[in-house]
Amino acid sequence: MGELPLDINIQEPRWDQSTFLGRARHFFTVTDPRNLLLSGAQLEASRNIVQNYRAGVVTPGITEDQLWRAKYVYDSAFHPDTGEKVVLIGRMSAQVPMNMTITGCMLTFYRKTPTVVFWQWVNQSFNAIVNYSNRSGDTPITVRQLGTAYVSATTGAVATALGLKSLTKHLPPLVGRFVPFAAVAAANCINIPLMRQRELQVGIPVADEAGQRLGYSVTAAKQGIFQVVISRICMAIPAMAIPPLIMDTLEKKDFLKRRPWLGAPLQVGLVGFCLVFATPLCCALFPQKSSIHVSKLEPELRAQIHEQNPSIEVVYYNKGL
């Protein structure tokens, strides 16, 4: 077997990101919870394989599949800009197990005010860790911005949950089960724009098809943030809509009436099953490298791009996660 060639582009995902299927395969790999079980030595080995390959040194005996596996293990644990190891619960591979536990508990303990407040706070604390761990190198999050987004999202989620809880007191019990979803949706609408407020102020980098940076656009930032909010809300729908319907039916059966302690683990399991599919599929709704027509950009940036290259009609940007 010959040595692996050096022309494999491991800077980009393995699968075609212009198709939904290609993006889905990419995110199924990125969010794979099994990556959390890898030891520090395994993570370092993957980092060495990737960094050596990028430097033009091929690890002896490695296959293309092993190279791609090392790339995804490396990406799952290390920050792409700083190279620092991301805290365990801040990694994309922790999304399913962490959200499974938190969402399952939000859906189980939705009746009493103290537990509603507690689990909404836990959820927003986890979101803050994820957002900080995956912050952009171009537009870093300051501690003040993180704190503002955290407090605002937590307040918004708790206020929505308690307000709707009060309004649904006299409605069928099934309606009350959907209050946590409304709170999470409201929090996403607050948290993500605040967390990325610097992008809304100065814009995000836009580039041509070859990756040549052309400037910064607030319009592109707004479009990217909107797409992320939609993805996050869609991600929560299956996990926060399907289990309540199933649990509402099961709790009327004698089996669960005699074993009420089974309610929480059963709900967490149902949420986990939904999230295993919803997380990667909803991350794949929009291309990571999104596009926008030059005609929709700010007049100054539009003029600047036309001056550099009048033939450019579409520019690209990283929408974030």
Swiss-Prot record:
GO molecular function, one term: L-serine transmembrane transporter activity
Family statement: Belongs to the sideroflexin family.
InterPro entries the record matches: Mtc (IPR004686)
Residue ranges that the Swiss-Prot or TrEMBL entry lists as coiled coil: none
Locations listed in the record: Mitochondrion membrane
NCBIfam families registered for this protein in UniProt: mtc
Reaction it catalyzes: L-serine(in) = L-serine(out)
Keywords: Acetylation, Amino-acid transport, Membrane, Mitochondrion, One-carbon metabolism, Transmembrane, Transmembrane helix, Transport
Membrane-crossing residue ranges in chain numbering: 146-164, 174-194, 226-246, 266-286
UniProt modified residues of type N-acetylmethionine: 1
Entry function: Mitochondrial serine transporter that mediates transport of serine into mitochondria, an important step of the one-carbon metabolism pathway. Mitochondrial serine is converted to glycine and formate, which then exits to the cytosol where it is used to generate the charged folates that serve as one-carbon donors.
Official protein name in the record: Sideroflexin-3
UniProt-listed GO biological process terms: mitochondrial transmembrane transport; one-carbon metabolic process; serine import into mitochondrion
Species assigned in the record: Pongo abelii (Sumatran orangutan)
GO cellular component: mitochondrial inner membrane; mitochondrion
Pfam families per record: SFXNs (PF03820)
Topological type in the membrane: Multi-pass membrane protein
